[in-house]
Amino acid sequence: MQTLFLSLLAAAVTVHAYGSGGSNWDQAYSRAKDALQKLNQTEKVGLVTGVKWMGGPCVGNTYKPESIDYPSLCLQDSPLGIRFANPVTAFPAGINAGATWDTQLLYARGAAMGAEAKGLGIHVQLGPVAGPLGKNPNGGRNWEGFSVDPYLSGVAMEKTIRGMQDSGVQACAKHWLGNEQEHYRDTISSNIGDRAAHELYVWPFMDAVKAGVASVMCSYNKVNGTWACESDALNNKLMKEELGFPGYIMSDWNAQHSTVNSAVSGLDMTMPGSDFSNPPGSIFWGSNLEAAVADGSVPQSRLDDMVTRILAAWYLVGQDQGYPPVAFSSWNGGKANVDVTADHGTVARAVARDSIVLLKNGHGTLPLRKPKSLAIVGSDAIVNPAGPNACSDRGCNNGTLAMGWGSGTAEFPYLVGPLDAIQKRAAADGTKIVPSATDDPTAGASAAAAAETAIVFINSDSGEGYITVEGNLGDRNNLDPWHNGNELVKAVAAASKNVIVVIHSVGPIILETILAQPSVKAIVWAGLPGQESGNALVDVIYGDTTPSGKLPYTIAKQAADYGASWINAETDDFPEGLYVDYRHFDAKGIAPRYEFGYGLSYTTFKYSGLWVNMDASAGAANGQVVPGGPADLFEVVGQVSVSVRNNGRVAGAEVAQLYLGLPDSAPATPPKQLRGFQKLMLQPGQTGRATFKLTRRDLSYWDVQQQKWVVPSGTFKVYVGSSSRDIREEGSFRVRRGW
């Protein structure tokens, strides 16, 4: 098997990537090097070593030097808001942000999160998430990321990071690399093939680095037999040399395993500084690192490089200019002395609303038109009676599901439950509500029988492996709805002729039992919508907004169709290679239930006028390395466009999607891969033009012999449509043999 970094040497190096960075990084490095000269050795070590768990107000804190005007750095979760603080906004999860396929909303969500972090004095917000990518559909933390597709995930990473850092907080791209399951995450070795690593798992991190991300977090697992946080191949060779990353690499909390090896292999900051329980010998850096530099085990230049990278990131986002002090403590209930939420609930609602995916809509069941009566069935329709924050880190499944569990969470300032929002709308419409906020099938059937239409709420939860919920150790045990959701739907469908199913889930669930019920006329996926859950749902099911979300993953007919799942072992050889999610379904000829990129609307769209203009030559990318990779890899070499017309009677947004098929001269490759998308908002009868700019990277595959990105020669296939399988326009272009 070809393994990651096959041809790379194991020798430790000190990498200086800043010389090839953009002007902002260059200026930041100039200032960082000046500051470095003023620090003594103990202060340098203090900048790269956490003060220990609960040693400061944040989940991660560094020592404050006296020689320069630089703070104790505050590092804080999470990728969807601020953990352990209130009041803050509980935004929709990453998987919902990805399902919007909306670059403006992705940026706005990142900017709002960054503004709240800065307002609380947080220097580093621990997100966004590119790993797990989500190769295992039941992986526990998939929902923290944006999509199983690396292109969509990469765009979302770029927009989110730019939004966060434009607001003044340092972003942290995580988890680097191969952290695809929670079972055995502290011991498992992710043995990833070199090509699959680059084309799938590294790809969105390239976009993060290109966007100027300040920091990267290495993961708990091993990669090809070496701990991720002390892998020279992973951190020095790939991240810092190949991707030209000028920022710093921090450990996940307690993911460090050594003093010298981690230092010389590219780790720049250790968190939280000591083990949670702080046993003797658990501090790998601090005085131990200072001693290792003194005896020559770690070069002085390596320590100076760590510090320079950390200082440069601080200068890069302007945190030296009037940055607020830390305004909360994670350990006393998180009550902040400032309110940073502003109007961010509006952003949260927009993301939640535009991420909703309409999976089925038989007989125009939706939108609702002032029904005389509605049965609202299922515990997922209401807020946890004990309160939305009753379970630490959301480690329970009681009431409506609006985020998964673990460190990637935030405290709800409020949570609008679906029943509450529907009742408010129903009161205005004169609709009678018949509630059954329980998962008991008999009670649900009774409520449904007394109403014109029944809406059944079901869910499926997951999270981080340090919490087990209902027997699920982070990863989901299966892809079925929780709390006997299938039986609940069957009972309601037997009692009602008009059933709508709403799904709150961390990822795909198998829907065959539900679809087998003739009375189920509509199915809505609402994901993990955050604090504005009910309001966003009402916006869509009542037709105030036309649904425009698209699936960020495939929904299969049976779990076995995915060809991947978390494994009960300490080694994962990633046997699926490149063939993950729709790439696997396409290559194997497996019909999904709902394909990647799928989503219905209340209107219809017609595609026409495909236009392709290409000026690319075959060959390898050989340009100077800039943040993200070789500069020529990101050159625009072509353009594809298509017209999209709204043929319906209501306004709606359509996500036009571009997929490419590589020529036969390329080694075995999935039949098609996403390489562009654009969301168009169109009034009835209006035509818009979707335009996709293609770079050399979009046309390339990773050549394991050359260790370069290569554009193959021959005929490329062009597919444009409404999903990965609903292709409306096809074309092709040829790439000549060249440089």
Swiss-Prot record:
The active site is at residue 252. Keywords: Carbohydrate metabolism, Cellulose degradation, Glycoprotein, Glycosidase, Hydrolase, Polysaccharide degradation, Secreted, Signal. It catalyses: Hydrolysis of terminal, non-reducing beta-D-glucosyl residues with release of beta-D-glucose. InterPro entries: Cellulose_deg_GH3, Fn3-like, Glyco_hydro_3_C, Glyco_hydro_3_C_sf, Glyco_hydro_3_N, Glyco_hydro_3_N_sf, Glycoside_hydrolase_SF, Ig-like_fold. It is found in: Secreted. It is an enzyme of class 3 (hydrolase). Pathway: Glycan metabolism; cellulose degradation. One of its GO terms (biological process) is cellulose catabolic process. Its EC number is 3.2.1.21. The keyword Acyltransferase does not apply. Glycans are attached at residues 40, 224, 398. GO terms for cellular component: extracellular region. Residues 1-17 form the signal peptide. Belongs to the glycosyl hydrolase 3 family. Beta-glucosidases are one of a number of cellulolytic enzymes involved in the degradation of cellulosic biomass. Catalyzes the last step releasing glucose from the inhibitory cellobiose. This is Probable beta-glucosidase L.
